[in-house]
Swiss-Prot record:
Residues holding thiamine diphosphate: H72, G111, H112, S113, G143, A144, N171, Y278, E360
Family, per entry: Belongs to the transketolase family. DXPS subfamily.
Protein name, as recorded: 1-deoxy-D-xylulose-5-phosphate synthase
Keyword annotations of the record: Isoprene biosynthesis, Magnesium, Metal-binding, Thiamine biosynthesis, Thiamine pyrophosphate, Transferase
Assembly information from the UniProt record: Homodimer.
Name of the encoding gene: dxs
Length: 615
Protein backbone atom coordinates (compact mmCIF):
# COMPACT_ATOMS: atom_id res chain seq x y z
CA UNK A 1 0.00 0.00 0.00
CA UNK A 2 1.34 3.40 -0.96
CA UNK A 3 1.92 5.79 1.92
CA UNK A 4 1.83 9.04 -0.05
CA UNK A 5 -1.94 9.37 0.17
CA UNK A 6 -3.18 6.40 2.22
CA UNK A 7 -3.54 7.33 5.88
CA UNK A 8 -5.22 5.78 8.87
CA UNK A 9 -7.00 7.97 11.39
CA UNK A 10 -4.04 7.69 13.75
CA UNK A 11 -1.59 8.74 11.06
CA UNK A 12 -3.65 11.78 10.09
CA UNK A 13 -3.91 12.86 13.74
CA UNK A 14 -0.10 13.04 13.93
CA UNK A 15 0.17 15.46 11.01
CA UNK A 16 0.43 19.19 11.57
CA UNK A 17 -2.10 21.53 9.99
CA UNK A 18 0.51 22.53 7.42
CA UNK A 19 1.20 18.90 6.57
CA UNK A 20 -2.53 18.27 6.16
CA UNK A 21 -2.78 21.25 3.81
CA UNK A 22 0.14 19.91 1.80
CA UNK A 23 -1.60 16.53 1.63
CA UNK A 24 -4.73 18.24 0.30
CA UNK A 25 -2.70 20.04 -2.37
CA UNK A 26 -1.01 16.80 -3.44
CA UNK A 27 -4.36 15.06 -3.67
CA UNK A 28 -5.74 17.80 -5.87
CA UNK A 29 -2.77 17.40 -8.21
CA UNK A 30 -3.33 13.64 -8.36
CA UNK A 31 -7.06 13.99 -9.03
CA UNK A 32 -6.48 16.54 -11.80
CA UNK A 33 -3.79 14.38 -13.37
CA UNK A 34 -5.91 11.20 -13.43
CA UNK A 35 -9.19 12.83 -14.46
CA UNK A 36 -7.41 14.69 -17.27
CA UNK A 37 -6.55 11.27 -18.74
CA UNK A 38 -9.59 9.17 -17.83
CA UNK A 39 -12.37 11.72 -17.54
CA UNK A 40 -14.59 11.85 -14.49
CA UNK A 41 -16.19 14.20 -12.00
CA UNK A 42 -13.54 16.86 -11.57
CA UNK A 43 -14.97 19.99 -9.97
CA UNK A 44 -17.04 18.23 -7.31
CA UNK A 45 -14.01 16.24 -6.14
CA UNK A 46 -11.72 19.25 -6.06
CA UNK A 47 -14.27 20.99 -3.86
CA UNK A 48 -14.49 18.15 -1.34
CA UNK A 49 -10.80 17.40 -0.64
CA UNK A 50 -10.54 19.06 2.79
CA UNK A 51 -13.94 17.74 3.88
CA UNK A 52 -12.85 14.17 3.11
CA UNK A 53 -9.50 14.52 4.87
CA UNK A 54 -11.19 15.93 7.97
CA UNK A 55 -13.73 13.09 7.99
CA UNK A 56 -10.92 10.53 7.96
CA UNK A 57 -9.07 12.38 10.73
CA UNK A 58 -11.95 12.87 13.18
CA UNK A 59 -13.77 9.60 12.51
CA UNK A 60 -12.58 6.04 12.02
CA UNK A 61 -13.22 4.95 8.44
CA UNK A 62 -12.72 1.32 9.49
CA UNK A 63 -15.75 1.32 11.79
CA UNK A 64 -17.78 4.53 11.33
CA UNK A 65 -20.03 4.32 8.25
CA UNK A 66 -18.84 6.88 5.68
CA UNK A 67 -21.71 7.56 3.30
CA UNK A 68 -21.12 9.70 0.22
CA UNK A 69 -24.25 10.99 -1.46
CA UNK A 70 -24.12 10.20 -5.19
CA UNK A 71 -20.46 9.43 -4.33
CA UNK A 72 -19.10 11.15 -7.42
CA UNK A 73 -17.09 13.30 -4.96
CA UNK A 74 -15.37 10.33 -3.26
CA UNK A 75 -11.97 10.41 -5.02
CA UNK A 76 -10.11 11.80 -1.99
CA UNK A 77 -11.74 9.12 0.16
CA UNK A 78 -10.48 6.48 -2.27
CA UNK A 79 -6.92 7.82 -2.07
CA UNK A 80 -6.98 7.99 1.72
CA UNK A 81 -8.34 4.43 1.84
CA UNK A 82 -5.34 2.97 0.05
CA UNK A 83 -6.48 3.03 -3.58
CA UNK A 84 -3.54 5.08 -4.88
CA UNK A 85 -1.91 2.15 -6.66
CA UNK A 86 -5.04 1.56 -8.74
CA UNK A 87 -6.26 5.16 -8.88
CA UNK A 88 -4.88 5.52 -12.41
CA UNK A 89 -7.48 2.91 -13.49
CA UNK A 90 -10.34 5.17 -12.35
CA UNK A 91 -13.51 4.54 -14.43
CA UNK A 92 -11.67 2.15 -16.75
CA UNK A 93 -12.75 -1.37 -17.58
CA UNK A 94 -11.95 -3.73 -14.67
CA UNK A 95 -10.53 -0.70 -12.83
CA UNK A 96 -11.52 1.50 -9.91
CA UNK A 97 -15.11 2.73 -9.94
CA UNK A 98 -15.84 6.45 -10.08
CA UNK A 99 -18.39 5.88 -7.31
CA UNK A 100 -18.41 4.05 -3.99
CA UNK A 101 -18.81 0.27 -4.08
CA UNK A 102 -18.79 -2.27 -1.23
CA UNK A 103 -16.69 -4.58 -3.40
CA UNK A 104 -13.96 -1.91 -3.21
CA UNK A 105 -14.24 -1.59 0.57
CA UNK A 106 -16.81 1.20 0.76
CA UNK A 107 -19.81 1.17 3.08
CA UNK A 108 -22.55 1.40 0.46
CA UNK A 109 -23.09 1.71 -3.27
CA UNK A 110 -24.10 5.11 -4.64
CA UNK A 111 -24.62 6.80 -7.97
CA UNK A 112 -28.09 8.28 -7.73
CA UNK A 113 -28.78 11.31 -5.59
CA UNK A 114 -30.13 11.98 -2.11
CA UNK A 115 -29.87 8.53 -0.52
CA UNK A 116 -27.14 9.28 2.04
CA UNK A 117 -29.22 10.62 4.93
CA UNK A 118 -31.69 7.73 4.72
CA UNK A 119 -28.75 5.33 4.79
CA UNK A 120 -27.35 7.18 7.79
CA UNK A 121 -30.68 6.88 9.63
CA UNK A 122 -30.82 3.16 8.93
CA UNK A 123 -27.23 2.72 10.05
CA UNK A 124 -28.02 4.63 13.26
CA UNK A 125 -30.88 2.26 14.07
CA UNK A 126 -28.75 -0.81 13.42
CA UNK A 127 -25.89 0.53 15.53
CA UNK A 128 -28.27 1.29 18.41
CA UNK A 129 -29.79 -2.19 18.27
CA UNK A 130 -26.31 -3.70 18.33
CA UNK A 131 -25.32 -1.56 21.30
CA UNK A 132 -22.30 -0.17 19.47
CA UNK A 133 -20.72 3.30 19.60
CA UNK A 134 -20.16 3.98 15.92
CA UNK A 135 -21.27 7.26 14.33
CA UNK A 136 -22.47 7.45 10.71
CA UNK A 137 -21.14 10.39 8.69
CA UNK A 138 -23.01 11.41 5.54
CA UNK A 139 -21.49 13.83 3.04
CA UNK A 140 -24.21 15.41 0.91
CA UNK A 141 -24.16 18.32 -1.52
CA UNK A 142 -26.66 21.15 -1.52
CA UNK A 143 -27.89 19.99 -4.93
CA UNK A 144 -28.71 16.54 -3.55
CA UNK A 145 -30.42 18.16 -0.59
CA UNK A 146 -33.05 19.54 -2.96
CA UNK A 147 -34.62 16.09 -3.35
CA UNK A 148 -37.58 15.07 -1.23
CA UNK A 149 -35.98 11.86 0.03
CA UNK A 150 -33.31 13.87 1.85
CA UNK A 151 -35.97 15.81 3.75
CA UNK A 152 -37.90 12.65 4.58
CA UNK A 153 -34.75 11.32 6.21
CA UNK A 154 -33.96 14.59 8.01
CA UNK A 155 -37.48 14.61 9.40
CA UNK A 156 -36.99 11.24 11.08
CA UNK A 157 -33.39 11.88 12.06
CA UNK A 158 -34.27 15.07 13.94
CA UNK A 159 -36.87 13.20 15.95
CA UNK A 160 -34.62 10.22 16.68
CA UNK A 161 -31.74 11.90 18.56
CA UNK A 162 -29.28 9.32 17.22
CA UNK A 163 -25.60 10.33 17.10
CA UNK A 164 -25.09 11.17 13.45
CA UNK A 165 -23.22 13.78 11.42
CA UNK A 166 -24.53 15.25 8.18
CA UNK A 167 -21.75 17.15 6.43
CA UNK A 168 -23.42 19.53 3.98
CA UNK A 169 -21.13 20.45 1.10
CA UNK A 170 -22.62 23.75 -0.07
CA UNK A 171 -21.01 24.79 -3.34
CA UNK A 172 -23.97 27.01 -4.28
CA UNK A 173 -25.42 24.53 -6.73
CA UNK A 174 -28.84 24.77 -5.09
CA UNK A 175 -29.22 26.27 -1.62
CA UNK A 176 -27.97 29.76 -2.43
CA UNK A 177 -29.88 30.15 -5.66
CA UNK A 178 -33.38 30.95 -4.34
CA UNK A 179 -32.40 34.12 -2.46
CA UNK A 180 -29.13 34.95 -4.20
CA UNK A 181 -27.12 37.87 -2.87
CA UNK A 182 -29.09 38.18 0.39
CA UNK A 183 -28.44 34.53 1.23
CA UNK A 184 -24.76 34.94 0.46
CA UNK A 185 -24.52 38.07 2.60
CA UNK A 186 -26.27 36.45 5.55
CA UNK A 187 -24.16 33.31 5.30
CA UNK A 188 -21.02 35.42 5.46
CA UNK A 189 -22.38 37.65 8.21
CA UNK A 190 -23.44 34.80 10.47
CA UNK A 191 -19.92 33.61 11.19
CA UNK A 192 -19.76 30.39 13.10
CA UNK A 193 -18.37 31.78 16.34
CA UNK A 194 -20.88 34.61 16.46
CA UNK A 195 -23.90 32.45 15.73
CA UNK A 196 -22.94 29.70 18.19
CA UNK A 197 -22.05 32.16 20.98
CA UNK A 198 -25.32 34.03 20.37
CA UNK A 199 -27.31 30.83 20.87
CA UNK A 200 -25.46 30.10 24.10
CA UNK A 201 -26.14 33.59 25.44
CA UNK A 202 -29.83 33.24 24.60
CA UNK A 203 -29.96 29.90 26.44
CA UNK A 204 -28.40 31.42 29.57
CA UNK A 205 -30.76 34.38 29.36
CA UNK A 206 -33.80 32.10 29.24
CA UNK A 207 -32.69 30.41 32.46
CA UNK A 208 -32.60 33.61 34.53
CA UNK A 209 -35.31 35.83 33.05
CA UNK A 210 -38.87 36.01 34.45
CA UNK A 211 -41.67 34.45 32.39
CA UNK A 212 -42.71 37.62 30.54
CA UNK A 213 -39.14 38.46 29.59
CA UNK A 214 -38.50 34.83 28.66
CA UNK A 215 -41.41 34.96 26.24
CA UNK A 216 -39.99 38.08 24.57
CA UNK A 217 -36.49 36.56 24.43
CA UNK A 218 -37.86 33.44 22.77
CA UNK A 219 -39.71 35.57 20.23
CA UNK A 220 -36.46 37.44 19.54
CA UNK A 221 -34.57 34.18 19.11
CA UNK A 222 -37.19 32.86 16.69
CA UNK A 223 -37.05 36.11 14.70
CA UNK A 224 -33.27 35.85 14.57
CA UNK A 225 -33.52 32.29 13.27
CA UNK A 226 -35.50 33.51 10.28
CA UNK A 227 -32.35 35.11 8.89
CA UNK A 228 -29.88 32.36 9.78
CA UNK A 229 -28.87 29.52 7.46
CA UNK A 230 -29.57 26.84 10.09
CA UNK A 231 -33.26 27.57 10.57
CA UNK A 232 -34.52 24.59 8.59
CA UNK A 233 -32.31 22.06 10.34
CA UNK A 234 -32.90 23.38 13.86
CA UNK A 235 -36.66 23.39 13.33
CA UNK A 236 -36.38 19.71 12.37
CA UNK A 237 -34.63 18.99 15.68
CA UNK A 238 -31.08 18.83 14.40
CA UNK A 239 -28.08 20.60 15.84
CA UNK A 240 -26.51 23.03 13.39
CA UNK A 241 -22.93 24.21 13.02
CA UNK A 242 -21.98 26.73 10.40
CA UNK A 243 -21.64 28.00 7.89
CA UNK A 244 -17.92 27.19 7.96
CA UNK A 245 -15.17 27.47 5.36
CA UNK A 246 -15.09 24.07 3.68
CA UNK A 247 -11.47 24.58 2.63
CA UNK A 248 -10.14 25.56 6.06
CA UNK A 249 -8.97 22.26 7.53
CA UNK A 250 -8.65 23.63 11.04
CA UNK A 251 -12.20 24.93 10.98
CA UNK A 252 -13.63 21.72 9.52
CA UNK A 253 -11.80 19.48 11.98
CA UNK A 254 -12.98 21.62 14.89
CA UNK A 255 -16.59 21.47 13.68
CA UNK A 256 -16.49 17.71 13.19
CA UNK A 257 -15.03 17.17 16.67
CA UNK A 258 -17.74 19.40 18.13
CA UNK A 259 -20.44 17.46 16.30
CA UNK A 260 -18.94 14.14 17.36
CA UNK A 261 -18.94 15.20 21.01
CA UNK A 262 -22.62 16.21 20.89
CA UNK A 263 -23.78 12.60 20.48
CA UNK A 264 -26.84 13.96 18.67
CA UNK A 265 -27.86 14.35 15.04
CA UNK A 266 -25.95 17.35 13.74
CA UNK A 267 -25.64 19.18 10.44
CA UNK A 268 -22.35 20.89 9.61
CA UNK A 269 -22.83 23.45 6.86
CA UNK A 270 -19.57 23.82 4.92
CA UNK A 271 -19.27 26.31 2.09
CA UNK A 272 -16.94 25.15 -0.68
CA UNK A 273 -15.81 26.18 -4.13
CA UNK A 274 -16.51 23.68 -6.87
CA UNK A 275 -13.31 23.13 -8.85
CA UNK A 276 -11.12 24.48 -6.03
CA UNK A 277 -7.42 24.44 -6.95
CA UNK A 278 -7.87 24.31 -10.72
CA UNK A 279 -8.39 27.88 -11.91
CA UNK A 280 -10.07 26.91 -15.16
CA UNK A 281 -12.76 24.97 -13.28
CA UNK A 282 -13.49 27.32 -10.38
CA UNK A 283 -16.91 28.89 -10.72
CA UNK A 284 -17.79 26.99 -13.89
CA UNK A 285 -20.18 24.44 -12.41
CA UNK A 286 -21.72 22.76 -15.42
CA UNK A 287 -18.69 22.61 -17.70
CA UNK A 288 -16.36 20.88 -15.25
CA UNK A 289 -18.85 18.71 -13.36
CA UNK A 290 -18.38 15.62 -15.50
CA UNK A 291 -15.62 15.78 -18.11
CA UNK A 292 -13.82 13.69 -20.66
CA UNK A 293 -10.05 13.63 -21.06
CA UNK A 294 -8.58 17.14 -21.30
CA UNK A 295 -5.33 19.07 -21.53
CA UNK A 296 -4.46 20.37 -18.05
CA UNK A 297 -2.79 23.57 -19.25
CA UNK A 298 -5.48 24.73 -21.66
CA UNK A 299 -8.51 22.87 -20.32
CA UNK A 300 -9.38 21.85 -23.86
CA UNK A 301 -10.76 18.40 -24.59
CA UNK A 302 -8.22 15.99 -26.07
CA UNK A 303 -10.92 13.82 -27.59
CA UNK A 304 -10.99 13.89 -31.36
CA UNK A 305 -13.85 16.08 -32.43
CA UNK A 306 -16.90 14.14 -33.58
CA UNK A 307 -18.56 15.87 -36.48
CA UNK A 308 -21.76 13.92 -35.84
CA UNK A 309 -24.25 15.54 -33.54
CA UNK A 310 -25.14 13.67 -30.38
CA UNK A 311 -28.63 12.26 -29.93
CA UNK A 312 -29.08 14.82 -27.15
CA UNK A 313 -28.23 17.68 -29.50
CA UNK A 314 -30.63 16.32 -32.10
CA UNK A 315 -33.39 16.06 -29.50
CA UNK A 316 -32.73 19.60 -28.30
CA UNK A 317 -32.83 21.10 -31.81
CA UNK A 318 -35.98 19.21 -32.77
CA UNK A 319 -37.73 20.24 -29.58
CA UNK A 320 -36.76 23.86 -30.20
CA UNK A 321 -38.31 23.63 -33.65
CA UNK A 322 -41.46 22.00 -32.30
CA UNK A 323 -41.75 24.52 -29.46
CA UNK A 324 -41.61 27.41 -31.92
CA UNK A 325 -44.31 25.72 -33.99
CA UNK A 326 -46.63 24.57 -31.19
CA UNK A 327 -47.12 27.00 -28.33
CA UNK A 328 -48.70 24.40 -26.05
CA UNK A 329 -45.43 22.46 -25.78
CA UNK A 330 -43.85 22.71 -22.33
CA UNK A 331 -41.02 20.77 -20.75
CA UNK A 332 -39.12 19.88 -17.63
CA UNK A 333 -35.85 18.36 -16.52
CA UNK A 334 -34.69 17.31 -13.06
CA UNK A 335 -31.30 18.99 -12.50
CA UNK A 336 -30.01 17.94 -15.93
CA UNK A 337 -30.60 20.94 -18.22
CA UNK A 338 -27.34 20.68 -20.17
CA UNK A 339 -27.21 16.88 -20.01
CA UNK A 340 -30.64 16.56 -21.61
CA UNK A 341 -30.31 19.54 -23.95
CA UNK A 342 -33.21 21.32 -22.30
CA UNK A 343 -30.96 24.25 -21.35
CA UNK A 344 -31.45 25.77 -24.81
CA UNK A 345 -35.22 25.70 -24.34
CA UNK A 346 -35.10 27.05 -20.79
CA UNK A 347 -33.03 29.94 -22.11
CA UNK A 348 -35.34 30.72 -25.04
CA UNK A 349 -38.68 29.93 -23.37
CA UNK A 350 -38.19 30.43 -19.61
CA UNK A 351 -41.95 30.44 -19.01
CA UNK A 352 -42.49 27.10 -20.75
CA UNK A 353 -39.47 24.99 -19.79
CA UNK A 354 -38.14 24.38 -16.28
CA UNK A 355 -35.37 22.75 -14.30
CA UNK A 356 -37.00 21.61 -11.05
CA UNK A 357 -33.73 20.40 -9.43
CA UNK A 358 -33.32 16.80 -8.26
CA UNK A 359 -37.04 16.12 -8.08
CA UNK A 360 -38.00 13.49 -10.63
CA UNK A 361 -41.26 12.61 -8.87
CA UNK A 362 -42.35 16.23 -8.76
CA UNK A 363 -41.26 16.75 -12.37
CA UNK A 364 -43.50 13.96 -13.66
CA UNK A 365 -46.57 14.81 -11.59
CA UNK A 366 -46.37 18.55 -12.26
CA UNK A 367 -46.24 17.86 -15.99
CA UNK A 368 -49.20 15.49 -15.64
CA UNK A 369 -51.23 18.43 -14.35
CA UNK A 370 -50.10 20.55 -17.28
CA UNK A 371 -51.21 17.80 -19.66
CA UNK A 372 -54.57 17.76 -17.90
CA UNK A 373 -54.81 21.49 -18.63
CA UNK A 374 -54.23 20.98 -22.35
CA UNK A 375 -50.48 21.46 -22.64
CA UNK A 376 -48.10 18.94 -24.22
CA UNK A 377 -45.25 18.24 -21.78
CA UNK A 378 -41.89 16.79 -22.82
CA UNK A 379 -40.12 15.29 -19.81
CA UNK A 380 -36.40 15.17 -20.65
CA UNK A 381 -34.77 12.65 -18.33
CA UNK A 382 -32.02 10.04 -18.28
CA UNK A 383 -33.34 6.49 -18.56
CA UNK A 384 -31.77 5.54 -15.23
CA UNK A 385 -33.32 8.52 -13.40
CA UNK A 386 -36.85 7.78 -14.60
CA UNK A 387 -36.69 4.82 -12.21
CA UNK A 388 -36.94 7.37 -9.40
CA UNK A 389 -40.42 8.45 -10.52
CA UNK A 390 -41.99 5.11 -11.42
CA UNK A 391 -45.06 5.48 -9.21
CA UNK A 392 -45.77 8.91 -10.67
CA UNK A 393 -45.47 7.50 -14.20
CA UNK A 394 -48.13 4.91 -13.37
CA UNK A 395 -50.39 6.81 -10.98
CA UNK A 396 -50.34 10.28 -12.51
CA UNK A 397 -49.75 9.63 -16.22
CA UNK A 398 -50.68 6.09 -17.30
CA UNK A 399 -53.92 5.72 -15.32
CA UNK A 400 -55.00 9.20 -16.41
CA UNK A 401 -53.99 8.38 -20.02
CA UNK A 402 -52.45 11.84 -20.32
CA UNK A 403 -50.64 13.28 -23.32
CA UNK A 404 -47.15 13.29 -21.84
CA UNK A 405 -43.92 12.62 -23.75
CA UNK A 406 -41.05 10.93 -21.89
CA UNK A 407 -37.77 11.64 -23.69
CA UNK A 408 -35.35 9.11 -22.20
CA UNK A 409 -31.74 10.07 -22.81
CA UNK A 410 -28.75 7.77 -22.09
CA UNK A 411 -30.69 4.62 -22.97
CA UNK A 412 -28.49 1.54 -23.25
CA UNK A 413 -24.92 1.25 -22.00
CA UNK A 414 -23.59 4.62 -20.88
CA UNK A 415 -20.01 3.57 -20.20
CA UNK A 416 -17.77 4.80 -17.41
CA UNK A 417 -20.48 5.65 -14.87
CA UNK A 418 -21.27 1.97 -14.45
CA UNK A 419 -24.13 -0.04 -13.01
CA UNK A 420 -25.96 2.82 -11.29
CA UNK A 421 -26.30 4.69 -14.59
CA UNK A 422 -26.78 2.09 -17.31
CA UNK A 423 -30.08 2.74 -19.08
CA UNK A 424 -31.09 -0.86 -19.67
CA UNK A 425 -34.32 -1.26 -17.70
CA UNK A 426 -36.75 1.35 -19.08
CA UNK A 427 -38.36 -0.93 -21.66
CA UNK A 428 -38.95 -3.57 -19.00
CA UNK A 429 -40.66 -1.26 -16.52
CA UNK A 430 -42.68 0.75 -19.04
CA UNK A 431 -43.93 -2.03 -21.36
CA UNK A 432 -46.38 -3.51 -18.80
CA UNK A 433 -48.19 -0.19 -18.33
CA UNK A 434 -51.60 0.12 -20.01
CA UNK A 435 -52.05 3.17 -22.27
CA UNK A 436 -48.29 3.52 -22.83
CA UNK A 437 -46.69 3.66 -26.27
CA UNK A 438 -42.96 2.92 -26.62
CA UNK A 439 -40.72 3.67 -29.57
CA UNK A 440 -37.10 4.42 -30.44
CA UNK A 441 -35.32 6.14 -33.36
CA UNK A 442 -32.45 4.49 -35.22
CA UNK A 443 -30.93 7.71 -36.59
CA UNK A 444 -31.25 11.49 -36.76
CA UNK A 445 -33.99 11.66 -39.38
CA UNK A 446 -36.11 9.08 -37.60
CA UNK A 447 -35.63 11.04 -34.36
CA UNK A 448 -37.16 14.07 -36.03
CA UNK A 449 -40.09 12.05 -37.39
CA UNK A 450 -40.69 10.33 -34.07
CA UNK A 451 -40.69 13.58 -32.10
CA UNK A 452 -43.22 15.10 -34.49
CA UNK A 453 -45.34 11.97 -34.08
CA UNK A 454 -44.95 12.06 -30.29
CA UNK A 455 -46.37 15.57 -30.21
CA UNK A 456 -49.47 14.49 -32.15
CA UNK A 457 -49.92 11.20 -30.27
CA UNK A 458 -52.76 10.85 -27.78
CA UNK A 459 -51.76 9.23 -24.48
CA UNK A 460 -48.45 8.75 -22.65
CA UNK A 461 -45.55 7.96 -24.96
CA UNK A 462 -41.86 7.28 -24.31
CA UNK A 463 -38.94 7.43 -26.72
CA UNK A 464 -35.44 6.26 -25.89
CA UNK A 465 -32.14 7.30 -27.45
CA UNK A 466 -28.46 6.69 -26.68
CA UNK A 467 -25.66 8.61 -25.08
CA UNK A 468 -23.45 10.06 -27.79
CA UNK A 469 -24.22 9.83 -31.49
CA UNK A 470 -26.41 7.49 -33.48
CA UNK A 471 -24.31 4.89 -35.27
CA UNK A 472 -26.45 5.01 -38.39
CA UNK A 473 -26.52 8.11 -40.54
CA UNK A 474 -28.37 7.93 -43.86
CA UNK A 475 -28.05 4.24 -44.67
CA UNK A 476 -31.83 3.86 -44.90
CA UNK A 477 -34.61 6.15 -46.03
CA UNK A 478 -36.80 7.39 -43.19
CA UNK A 479 -40.44 6.41 -43.09
CA UNK A 480 -43.61 8.07 -41.92
CA UNK A 481 -44.36 7.17 -38.32
CA UNK A 482 -47.67 5.37 -37.88
CA UNK A 483 -48.85 3.82 -34.63
CA UNK A 484 -47.48 0.30 -34.23
CA UNK A 485 -45.87 0.15 -37.68
CA UNK A 486 -42.35 -1.19 -38.26
CA UNK A 487 -40.12 -0.68 -41.32
CA UNK A 488 -38.74 -3.53 -43.39
CA UNK A 489 -35.25 -2.28 -44.21
CA UNK A 490 -33.76 -5.33 -45.97
CA UNK A 491 -36.22 -7.80 -47.50
CA UNK A 492 -35.32 -11.17 -49.00
CA UNK A 493 -36.17 -14.87 -48.77
CA UNK A 494 -33.73 -15.71 -45.98
CA UNK A 495 -35.02 -17.91 -43.20
CA UNK A 496 -33.17 -15.63 -40.80
CA UNK A 497 -34.40 -12.20 -39.69
CA UNK A 498 -32.82 -9.45 -37.60
CA UNK A 499 -35.23 -7.40 -35.50
CA UNK A 500 -33.67 -4.16 -34.27
CA UNK A 501 -34.96 -1.57 -31.84
CA UNK A 502 -33.42 1.90 -31.57
CA UNK A 503 -29.63 1.76 -31.59
CA UNK A 504 -29.97 -2.01 -31.93
CA UNK A 505 -30.86 -1.50 -35.61
CA UNK A 506 -27.32 -0.25 -36.21
CA UNK A 507 -25.80 -3.33 -34.57
CA UNK A 508 -28.03 -5.58 -36.65
CA UNK A 509 -27.01 -3.75 -39.83
CA UNK A 510 -23.30 -4.02 -38.99
CA UNK A 511 -23.64 -7.78 -38.50
CA UNK A 512 -25.72 -8.09 -41.68
CA UNK A 513 -23.12 -6.25 -43.77
CA UNK A 514 -20.44 -8.65 -42.53
CA UNK A 515 -22.69 -11.58 -43.44
CA UNK A 516 -23.31 -10.20 -46.91
CA UNK A 517 -19.56 -10.05 -47.51
CA UNK A 518 -19.63 -13.82 -46.85
CA UNK A 519 -22.49 -14.25 -49.33
CA UNK A 520 -25.04 -14.73 -46.57
CA UNK A 521 -28.15 -12.67 -46.01
CA UNK A 522 -30.97 -11.94 -43.59
CA UNK A 523 -34.10 -9.83 -43.37
CA UNK A 524 -33.72 -6.63 -41.38
CA UNK A 525 -36.64 -5.03 -39.56
CA UNK A 526 -36.64 -1.76 -37.64
CA UNK A 527 -39.41 -2.35 -35.12
CA UNK A 528 -39.66 1.39 -34.37
CA UNK A 529 -42.38 0.55 -31.84
CA UNK A 530 -41.81 -1.85 -28.96
CA UNK A 531 -45.41 -1.29 -27.91
CA UNK A 532 -47.57 -1.84 -29.85
CA UNK A 533 -45.67 -4.23 -32.11
CA UNK A 534 -46.40 -4.38 -35.83
CA UNK A 535 -48.30 -7.67 -35.68
CA UNK A 536 -49.23 -7.61 -39.37
CA UNK A 537 -45.62 -7.33 -40.50
CA UNK A 538 -44.40 -9.89 -37.98
CA UNK A 539 -47.03 -12.41 -39.05
CA UNK A 540 -45.83 -12.01 -42.65
CA UNK A 541 -42.21 -12.36 -41.53
CA UNK A 542 -43.02 -15.57 -39.63
CA UNK A 543 -44.12 -17.23 -42.89
CA UNK A 544 -40.63 -17.01 -44.41
CA UNK A 545 -38.14 -16.52 -41.56
CA UNK A 546 -38.05 -19.10 -38.80
CA UNK A 547 -35.08 -17.75 -36.85
CA UNK A 548 -35.33 -14.25 -35.40
CA UNK A 549 -32.42 -12.44 -33.78
CA UNK A 550 -33.26 -9.58 -31.39
CA UNK A 551 -30.95 -6.54 -31.29
CA UNK A 552 -31.94 -4.19 -28.47
CA UNK A 553 -30.10 -2.35 -25.70
CA UNK A 554 -32.30 -3.46 -22.81
CA UNK A 555 -32.17 -6.41 -20.43
CA UNK A 556 -33.75 -9.61 -21.73
CA UNK A 557 -36.31 -9.89 -18.95
CA UNK A 558 -39.23 -7.70 -19.97
CA UNK A 559 -37.43 -6.56 -23.11
CA UNK A 560 -38.08 -7.05 -26.81
CA UNK A 561 -37.58 -10.81 -26.53
CA UNK A 562 -40.38 -11.02 -23.96
CA UNK A 563 -42.70 -8.90 -26.10
CA UNK A 564 -41.94 -10.93 -29.23
CA UNK A 565 -42.51 -14.23 -27.43
CA UNK A 566 -45.86 -12.97 -26.15
CA UNK A 567 -46.82 -12.08 -29.71
CA UNK A 568 -45.77 -15.50 -31.07
CA UNK A 569 -47.72 -17.28 -28.36
CA UNK A 570 -50.79 -15.16 -29.06
CA UNK A 571 -50.88 -16.29 -32.71
CA UNK A 572 -49.43 -19.78 -32.11
CA UNK A 573 -46.49 -19.04 -34.39
CA UNK A 574 -43.43 -21.26 -34.26
CA UNK A 575 -40.26 -19.23 -34.59
CA UNK A 576 -36.91 -19.65 -32.86
CA UNK A 577 -36.03 -16.42 -31.05
CA UNK A 578 -32.43 -15.59 -30.14
CA UNK A 579 -32.02 -12.42 -28.11
CA UNK A 580 -28.84 -10.35 -27.94
CA UNK A 581 -30.27 -8.21 -25.15
CA UNK A 582 -28.43 -7.98 -21.83
CA UNK A 583 -28.34 -10.79 -19.30
CA UNK A 584 -29.81 -10.67 -15.80
CA UNK A 585 -26.92 -8.91 -14.09
CA UNK A 586 -25.76 -5.35 -13.48
CA UNK A 587 -23.36 -3.97 -16.07
CA UNK A 588 -20.18 -2.46 -14.65
CA UNK A 589 -18.20 0.56 -15.77
CA UNK A 590 -15.78 1.05 -18.63
CA UNK A 591 -15.72 2.49 -22.13
CA UNK A 592 -18.83 1.39 -23.96
CA UNK A 593 -16.87 -0.47 -26.63
CA UNK A 594 -14.89 -2.37 -23.98
CA UNK A 595 -17.98 -3.16 -21.91
CA UNK A 596 -19.74 -4.52 -25.01
CA UNK A 597 -16.74 -6.69 -25.81
CA UNK A 598 -16.69 -8.06 -22.26
CA UNK A 599 -20.39 -8.88 -22.58
CA UNK A 600 -19.86 -10.38 -26.06
CA UNK A 601 -22.24 -7.78 -27.52
CA UNK A 602 -19.70 -6.26 -29.91
CA UNK A 603 -20.17 -6.80 -33.64
CA UNK A 604 -17.52 -9.54 -33.95
CA UNK A 605 -18.95 -11.55 -31.06
CA UNK A 606 -22.49 -11.20 -32.40
CA UNK A 607 -21.36 -12.22 -35.88
CA UNK A 608 -19.73 -15.35 -34.49
CA UNK A 609 -22.96 -16.32 -32.72
CA UNK A 610 -25.13 -15.65 -35.77
CA UNK A 611 -22.86 -17.66 -38.11
CA UNK A 612 -23.66 -20.82 -36.16
CA UNK A 613 -27.14 -20.70 -37.68
CA UNK A 614 -25.89 -20.59 -41.28
CA UNK A 615 -25.14 -23.88 -42.98
Amino acid sequence: MSKKFAHTQEELEKLSLKELENLAASMREKIIQVVSKNGGHLSSNLGAVELSIAMHLVFDAKKDPFIFDVSHQSYTHKLLSGKEEIFDTLRQINGLSGYTKPSEGDYFVAGHSSTSISLAVGACKAIALKGEKRIPVALIGDGALSAGMAYEALNELGDSKFPCVILLNDNEMSISKPIGAISKYLSQAMATQFYQSFKKRIAKMLDILPDSATYMAKRFEESFKLITPGLLFEELGLEYIGPIDGHNLGEIISALKQAKAMQKPCVIHAQTIKGKGYALAEGKHAKWHGVGAFDIDSGESVKKSDTKKSATEIFSKNLLDLASKYENIVGVTAAMPSGTGLDKLIEKYPNRFWDVAIAEQHAVTSMAAMAKEGFKPFIAIYSTFLQRAYDQVIHDCAIMNLNVVFAMDRAGIVGEDGETHQGVFDLSFLAPLPNFTLLAPRDEQMMQNIMEYAYLHQGPIALRYPRGSFILDKEFNPCEIKLGKAQWLVKNNSEIAFLGYGQGVAKAWQVLRALQEMNNNANLIDLIFAKPLDEELLCELAKKSKIWFIFSENVKIGGIESLINNFLQKYDLHVKVVSFEYEDKFIEHGKTSEVEKNLEKDVNSLLTKVLKFYH
